[in-house]
Swiss-Prot record:
Known partners and oligomeric status: Homodimer.
One Gene Ontology molecular-function label: ribonucleoside triphosphate phosphatase activity
Cofactor binding: number and manner: Binds 1 divalent metal cation per subunit; can use either Mg(2+) or Mn(2+).
Needed co-factor(s): Mg(2+); Mn(2+)
Organism from which the protein derives: Enterobacter cloacae
Protein role: Phosphatase that hydrolyzes non-canonical purine nucleotides such as XTP and ITP to their respective diphosphate derivatives. Probably excludes non-canonical purines from DNA/RNA precursor pool, thus preventing their incorporation into DNA/RNA and avoiding chromosomal lesions.
GO biological process, one term: nucleotide metabolic process
Family, as annotated: Belongs to the YjjX NTPase family.
Listed name of the protein: Inosine/xanthosine triphosphatase
Top EC group: hydrolase
Catalytic activity: XTP + H2O = XDP + phosphate + H(+); ITP + H2O = IDP + phosphate + H(+)
Disulphide bonds in the chain: none
Entry keyword set: Hydrolase, Magnesium, Manganese, Metal-binding, Nucleotide metabolism, Nucleotide-binding
SUPFAM superfamilies in the cross-refs: ITPase-like
């Protein structure tokens, strides 16, 4: 979950990237570690999580056990 102060700004229509940049001081954070990287202190990265999501989503198409 997002911290309430960040969630409120997103609910008001602001994009998450600029809001996170404002609070972290990291320019263009969305092109770097992303909010996920900040919230997990670098344990997870934005690109790593997206990679895993795509692999999991495509696994039924590449594994005979699903047929």
């Amino acid at each position: 979950p997002l911290p309430e102060i960040i969630l409120n700004k997103v609910r008001e229509g602001e994009a998450l990237g600029p809001v996170m940049s404002q609070y972290t001081g990291i320019d263009e954070i969305g092109r770097k570690e992303g909010a996920i990287g900040v919230f997990t202190k670098g344990v997870l990265t934005r690109s790593g999580v997206y990679h895993q999501a795509v692999v999991l989503a495509l696994s039924p198409f590449h594994n005979a056990i699903y047929r």
